[in-house]
Design a protein with these regions (language model features):
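Ribonuclease/tRNase effector modules and their secretory precursors
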Residues: 1-101
């Protein structure tokens, strides 16, 4: 398990094989994705496409300055990362719109 600053330093975990597959597919490391969860300006919604378990989707800025989309589930007091990718132009625009007030 990896400790992250999300929500006051709760634990983050992921399957190493899933993390490697995610990096090959999306070019995003889970270690970077967990930093997006610490973004105070992140947008988070419940994943409407998940029927099996309650999942969450966060659009946030990672430590490298990339806007990422991170999917995860809560396992007790631990965040279990499921997938992470770079935001589409539309998702990035939605994230940035919150600063235009």
């Amino acid at each position: 398990m990896h400790n992250c600053a999300y929500n006051g330093g709760v634990g983050c975990e992921w399957d190493p094989a899933k993390a490697q597959a995610n990096y090959k597919k999306h070019g995003v490391r889970f270690a970077d994705a967990e930093t997006a969860l610490s973004d105070e300006q992140a947008l988070t919604i419940r994943d409407p496409s998940s029927a099996d378990e309650e999942r969450w989707v966060t659009v946030g800025l990672d430590a490298l300055g990339q806007v990422l989309v991170v999917v995860y589930a809560w396992r007790g007091e631990t965040v279990r990362l499921i997938s992470a990718r770079k935001a589409t132009p539309r998702e990035r625009e939605q994230y940035e719109e919150q600063y235009e007030t």
